[in-house]
Amino acid sequence: MLNIDEIKKLIPHRYPFLLVDKITELEVGKRAVGIKNVTVNEPFFQGHFPEYPLMPGVLIVEALAQVCGVAMMSVEENKGKLGVFAGIDKVRIKREVRPGDTLTMEVEMTTLRKNIAKADAKAYVGEELVCKGELMFALVEK
């Protein structure tokens, strides 16, 4: 398990854009499971939507990407690199994410090479599938 301080050593995201609270499972370079406790205090709820707050789908995908970042950057050879989005495919949003929900994100790296990475990613609230898709990253030197 990784706490927020350990996550911040692996990925560069910071408040208000750090969307992972903890990592509950990590197989270095292979898979990771992360948690985001969604609260009414999230800055994006001020405008999306004040009368009916929903976590934007693009931020659910970003949260999944950050869990991928932890899996990728936990590999010793990737220290000092940055994983940046190179593509997203077959993404589907299946359910709303609202304040009070706990978002569980599961990612499995399907490709992890010197300069490219791909992952299958799924997010859940409880047992309900929220989002799924394929994410691709370029690994670049900082």
UniProtKB/Swiss-Prot annotation:
Chief localization: cytoplasm
List of catalytic residues: H48
Record's catalysed reaction(s): a (3R)-hydroxyacyl-[ACP] = a (2E)-enoyl-[ACP] + H2O
Entry-linked Pfam families: FabA
EC number from the UniProt entry: 4.2.1.59
Subcellular location: Cytoplasm
Protein name: 3-hydroxyacyl-[acyl-carrier-protein] dehydratase FabZ
Organism: Clostridioides difficile (strain 630)
Record lineage: Bacteria, Bacillati, Bacillota, Clostridia, Peptostreptococcales
Gene encoding the protein: fabZ
